[in-house]
Curated annotation (Swiss-Prot):
Signal peptide annotation: 1-23
UniProt organism field: Cochliobolus carbonum (strain 26-R-13) (Maize leaf spot fungus)
UniProt entry tagged with the keyword Nucleotidyltransferase: no
Protein known as: Polyglycine hydrolase
Active site per the UniProt annotation: S369
Source superkingdom: Eukaryota
InterPro entries assigned to the protein according to its UniProt record, in alphabetical order: Bact_CellWall_Synth/Modif (IPR050491), Beta-lactam-related (IPR001466), Beta-lactam/transpept-like (IPR012338), PGH-like_rpt (IPR049511)
Length: 644
């Protein structure tokens, strides 16, 4: 799989060309009525030869239709074509069909020299005798693009593009099973577009298992599928919104018309088509409610109340967040500032499609390791009430006296707070994310518990002598969360609510994706892996829903609380952002986990916090610039001007 960023249609057994006019539905749970397509006029063809397709394309071009999908399949001597054209205005375009590689490359170079961009490429046949079809358009906004054909490894494309950010827009599989070839096309990525690309190399990479995994991520969908002659499917998924969608695979020509008719009755448009097979062609089609993805809209809500020039603070803060979110493709965020636990600045930001929630200041975001601040406050309460001492040895306190590494008996509560307990995630796996591994080691089909994880770790050697150096560890706060429950007889969350939160609205972010189907805040990640909830299955889910190896119910004390930025800024007005005790000047805590990024910062007078619904921005430098330069300078200037 390549992770960086469909369309299909088809027609009748007795017809090689048809015109479809589809009206959008009057009701829909996904798209507001104002955002649905009005009337879409399409022209869909399939199972026609080279002479026919040239005639068809010329006629369509003359009538104002534009290509959205073009596919060549079959043998070089008897190539067949399928395509979708839509009637709409647009940039000039050129097409080529049935060209050998020499002719195709010359055509590509000719139109590239005239400022055209390759937008579609398709090939069929063996490597030595392949034939190509393609579309090029004059799109001034695309300044850089890269297309490679004739490679046996699609990952060679990444080497060709180097560090340049690229959105892969098309893939074509051709050649033979023993000498497979790929065409890969990509355009420059100017807005951190999120996608995953699956290049199959064998039948074990079945689209029917890929799609369910990819779509555990809310709003993700297939945008492109290409079929090899032996029916392997290359696919591209992204998180753009087109309302309802569906994919149909393995359709014979005789099944196409009925499928088109059925989908039309549901107001679904075919947007992409691919065929394969030299005898009986089978087709793959993507249907969508919206022919083109929804555009994003900018929203900023909330109040600024605590400064001499509130309007200017609002303007400056909004400019910082708008610039960051648009450049980094971040959809949801909050920023808050408080003094002595009272919120004086609260802004919620949305850069998203109309079928997603507009963020409010009260919405709760996954906090990642900012959750640890609440655990430290809970431990502080345990110490202040005499339940434990910082010098207590953690494992004997929990009833464990025979670890595999005797040095484990020397680990104190203070060591865990200071990240000096002997756990180095640079030497061993990050213990917070090995719940899947623990369950698999026990041949257990149910999720590993925190107790099982602790006992798994106890059977391993430490990475270094406790107390000799500090290395950030999620395991320390897992142990502290277990300690809280073990010594008080309450759940971690119950203890927090009774002794720490004082009415603040903080919750646990649960693991199952089904729990978050209707969440206003979508914690976004493009990555998937084996679910920690079903560790012995092959089921893959979004990392935020257990694909990262974490069971959040067990790891809540380390990185699985959710709250608003307002709540966080108020909390650190009373408690240390980092460390034990009351509020501390110029201390901060940074949190990152799949699907989230957050930061809490105490300055001289101001306490401020930021929450994002993803950590998949351009790079870590983008985050550091946002929080440690732009926001730090803004809040720092305001902080210094506030009265003591």
């Amino acid at each position: 799989m390549y992770t960086s960023r469909s369309l299909f249609s088809t027609l009748a057994s007795c017809l090689s060309l048809a015109t479809l006019v589809a009206s959008s539905p009057t009701t829909n749970q996904n798209l507001p009525s104002s955002k649905r397509d009005a009337t879409v006029e399409q022209n869909v063809f399939f199972d026609i030869n080279g002479k026919e397709v040239e005639t068809r394309i010329a006629k369509l071009k003359a009538e104002g239709y534009r290509p959205t999908s073009l596919n060549i399949h079959g043998t070089p001597t008897d190539a067949k074509y399928a395509g979708i054209w839509i009637k709409q205005d647009g940039n000039p375009y050129e097409t080529i069909v049935g060209a050998n590689k020499t002719t195709y490359d010359a055509w590509l170079d000719q139109w590239k020299a005239s400022g055209y961009v390759s937008t579609q490429v398709s090939a069929t046949g063996p490597a030595s005798n392949a034939v190509f079809a393609g579309v090029m358009e004059k799109i001034p906004s695309i300044r850089n693009w890269t297309q490679i054909c004739g490679t046996s490894s699609p990952y060679a494309y990444l080497n060709a593009t180097g560090d340049a950010p690229i959105v892969i827009t098309g893939v074509s599989l051709y050649g033979t099973p023993t000498e497979r070839q790929y065409c890969v096309l990509g355009h420059e990525d100017t807005d951190n577009h999120q996608q995953t690309v699956w290049f199959p190399t064998s039948s074990s990479q079945d689209y029917k298992t890929i799609e369910p995994a990819e779509t555990t991520k809310r709003f993700w969908r297939p945008v492109f599928i290409d079929s090899s002659e032996d029916k392997l499917l290359a696919s591209i998924f992204d998180d753009t919104s087109v309302g309802n969608w569906t994919v149909r695979t393995d359709l014979t020509a005789s099944q196409l018309q009925s499928e088109i008719t059925a989908q039309k009755a549901n107001n679904m448009h075919p947007i992409h088509i691919s065929g394969a097979g030299s005898t009986e062609t089978q087709y793959v089609v993507i249907f969508t409610e919206q022919a083109t993805p929804l555009e994003r809209n900018w929203h900023a809500v909330g109040d600024i109340t605590g400064f001499p020039d509130n309007a200017r603070v609002k303007r400056d803060l909004d400019e910082i967040l708008q610039k960051f979110m648009k450049r980094n493709s971040v959809r949801q965020a909050q920023v808050s500032a408080s003094i002595n636990g009272t919120v004086i600045a609260s802004r919620a930001y949305t850069w998203a499609e109309s079928n997603r929630a507009i963020v409010e200041p009260s919405d709760k975001f996954l906090l990642g390791s900012v959750s640890k601040a609440f655990t430290y406050a809970a431990v502080d309460h345990l110490v202040s009430t005499g339940v434990v001492n910082l010098t207590d040895h953690i494992y004997p306190l929990l009833g464990y006296t025979k670890p595999a590494d005797p040095r484990s008996l020397n680990i104190t509560i203070q060591h865990l707070l200071d990240h000096t307990g002997g756990f180095d995630r640079g030497m061993s796996p990050d213990i917070g994310f090995i719940f899947t591994t623990v369950a698999q080691s026990l041949n257990q089909s149910t999720p590993a518990t925190l107790r099982q994880l602790i006992e798994y770790v106890l059977a391993k050697p430490l990475d270094f002598e406790p107390g000799t150096r500090s290395v950030y560890s999620n395991y320390g706060t897992l142990l502290l969360g277990y300690l809280i429950a073990n010594k008080t007889g309450e759940t971690y969350m119950s203890y927090l609510e009774k002794n720490v939160l004082k009415g603040l609205d903080v919750e646990m972010y649960t693991t199952p994706g089904a729990d978050h189907t209707n969440d206003r805040i979508v914690q976004e990640t493009k990555f998937t892996s084996i679910s920690a909830l079903t560790p012995l299955s092959e089921k893959r889910v979004a990392n935020v829903y257990g694909g990262d190896g974490a069971v959040k119910e067990a790891a809540v004390s380390s990185f699985a609380l959710k709250a608003s930025a307002d709540t966080v800024s108020r909390f650190i007005g009373k408690h240390a952002a980092y460390g034990l005790g009351p509020r501390q000047l110029f201390m901060y805590r940074d949190g990152t986990v799949a699907g989230a990024r957050a930061l809490a910062y105490s300055m001289a007078k101001l306490d401020w916090a930021i929450t994002l619904n993803t950590r998949e921005y351009l790079d870590e430098n983008a985050w550091n610039t946002l929080v440690f330069t732009d926001l730090y300078q803004l809040w720092g200037a305001l902080d210094s001007a506030l009265p003591l």
